[in-house]
Amino acid sequence: PHPRFLHSFPTRRSSDLIKAVVALRSVKEACEIEEIDLACNIGYEMHTAAMRLCKPGVKEQYIAGVLDGIASSYGSMTSFATILTQHGETLHNHDHSHILEVGRMMLTDAGAERLSNYCSDHTRTVPVGGKFQGRQKDVYNIVLACHDKALEIARPGITYMSVHQEVCKVLAQGLKDLGLMKGNIDEAVAAGAHALFLPHGLGHMMGLDVHDMEDLGQIYVGYDDEVRPSSQFGLASLRMGRRLQEGFVITDEPGCYFIPALIDKWRAEKMHTDFLNYDAIDKFKDFGGIRLEDDILITPEGSRFTGEKRIPITIKEVEAIMNE
């Protein structure tokens, strides 16, 4: 449009209009859910291919390219720039330059976007070489328990902020059992000590965008007059906090990351020493990171996975498909 035409419009954003759009797009109709299911079916093919290709000596970029090709072969495209890395401790790591090494884990956060623009978004973390080792099993099962806790309690009427906080308690208890955290779990989570390992939120809206409607402002999409965002480290990154409604499609994506620079910073600043066992944590600095993510539909009774088949997620399922 001609600049003079654009100048005739007010520069202010209408919060009432934004709220109306959010209300319309938040609850998905049956035809929208069908499109998301189809996108998730493509995501299944992408992630299972990545698992089969995850072998020592393979370059990350090769696997990432294969995932792009799978999406394209279904007449779709990736729904965002694929994250595929053996350095999962770096969040949103788009560097695919490494050669996969035995003893590391490959984190793949990838999805498909159909021509209708409806998206999928899944994450799996698998052991290079196809077999989980000692402490990998321990941390993986903690993250899986967090993931399953969210599925267990997510339902209409509950706030996703409260789901996030319950998941954080599962994480903290698991890390306490490993000797990495200590003290009262409820107090540790309230203080935000667990955020050393989980510096992001549990999930976000899904739909026409991977982070659906994020451009309208997360304060309108994930929050409302009742549930307000927090300023606490970690919890401040929760994109979706408000009460769930039937028809919402959201992500469930807990993680556990050992970020050397963050560990060193917190230790130097004596952060949460009542709850964190830094001597034990230091031994995990070379661990990397784990995230497990599914897209879920809020139903009248609770929630369900989107897509026809769930991407392998238990240790037994993952090892089986990696060693076919």
Predicted regions located by residue number:
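Single conserved hydrophobic/aromatic residue that forms the stacking wall/gate
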Residues: P1-T11
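Active-site neighborhoods and metal-handling regions in enzymes and metal-associated proteins
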Residues: R12-E324
